[in-house]
């Protein structure tokens, strides 16, 4: 999902296509302004997801990225980062966008029986 221009074109052309955040925090956090605009524009098509396991520190980093304007923080708590030794910036999404990304979009995709 790090090529947001390409992903945006796919979302524009395929109305039933959704994206998640799995394994993209490192790239998205390097382009905070573009990422924030992308999330706001496509807020109904993005779902929260990670393939990093159940470690609390991983989730804290995702929340920090999505919910704050924190600058230049380490995205990876492991000794050897999975994607590079750089730092990222938070995008502080509006509350209504966070609600959709965290919960509402997935509820729409997987309605209760």
Outline where the language-model segments fall.
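H/E-rich (His + Asp/Glu) clusters that bind or coordinate divalent metals
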Residues: 1-113
